[in-house]
């Protein structure tokens, strides 16, 4: 009698355990299916705008890229064979875009994502950058001065060539007064370009600017502090 009572008590416990396991199993299966619904079953890539989920006639969904690879001609029609159930789906004109989208997955893809705000803390004011690195400003100034010297020399060469042409061709084309006026104007422009070309370069080469001296002093102090 004791054995029969023990068996009768153990049967409800085991039945409750089975019901618990069966109740828990669908929940786990549903979460796994939800994760699988968000990625293609062929390439295992998550759905996105280039990989839109497309439904076949068998209601199985795959990404558009995999369906393009599975597209073939059967009986003179474009069709796709489902990789899961092997059911054939006709594709009008061979256009994957003609297939219906998986609305549930597309709705999840259309949900707005949290935007990450970037704070450009590394950006500083150009004035602060110039104050922190005066050597860069000095180099830029020297480059501008050298470019101005080159432009002035080219202008002087062009004006000299123009003056020579006027002196050579002027007696045959222009009268005396106009010829001398043009010659005077070109000579004055040539003199000004020569002054702009020569004087700043000699001054800059002989006398260094205060900014250059300040940069050198900072370099020497920086080297001494490191030593």
Curated annotation (Swiss-Prot):
Keywords associated with the record: Endoplasmic reticulum, Membrane, Metal-binding, Transferase, Transmembrane, Transmembrane helix, Ubl conjugation, Ubl conjugation pathway, Zinc, Zinc-finger
Zinc finger (RING-type): 40-86
Gene Ontology molecular function: ubiquitin protein ligase activity; ubiquitin protein ligase binding; ubiquitin-protein transferase activity; zinc ion binding
Biological or metabolic pathway of the protein: Protein modification; protein ubiquitination
Residue intervals passing through the bilayer: 158-178, 180-200
Subcellular location: Endoplasmic reticulum membrane
Domain of life, per lineage: Eukaryota
InterPro entries: RING_finger_E3_ubiq-ligases, Znf_RING, Znf_RING/FYVE/PHD, Znf_RING_CS
Protein EC: 2.3.2.27
Membrane-protein topology: Multi-pass membrane protein
SUPFAM superfamilies: RING/U-box
Modification comment: Polyubiquitinated. 'Lys-29'-linked autoubiquitination leads to proteasomal degradation.
GO cellular component, as recorded: endoplasmic reticulum; endoplasmic reticulum membrane
Gene3D superfamilies found in the cross-reference section: Zinc/RING finger domain, C3HC4 (zinc finger)
GO biological process entries: intrinsic apoptotic signaling pathway in response to endoplasmic reticulum stress; proteasome-mediated ubiquitin-dependent protein catabolic process; protein autoubiquitination; protein K29-linked ubiquitination; protein K63-linked ubiquitination; protein localization to mitochondrion; regulation of autophagosome assembly
Transmembrane is among the record's keywords: yes
Subunit and interaction comment: Interacts with BNIP1.
Task performed by this protein: E3 ubiquitin protein ligase that is part of an apoptotic signaling pathway activated by endoplasmic reticulum stress. Stimulates the expression of proteins specific of the unfolded protein response (UPR), ubiquitinates BNIP1 and regulates its localization to the mitochondrion and induces calcium release from the endoplasmic reticulum that ultimately leads to cell apoptosis. Plays a role in the maintenance of intestinal homeostasis and clearance of enteric pathogens.
Name by which UniProt lists this protein: E3 ubiquitin-protein ligase RNF186
Species name: Homo sapiens
Taxon lineage: Eukaryota, Metazoa, Chordata, Craniata, Vertebrata
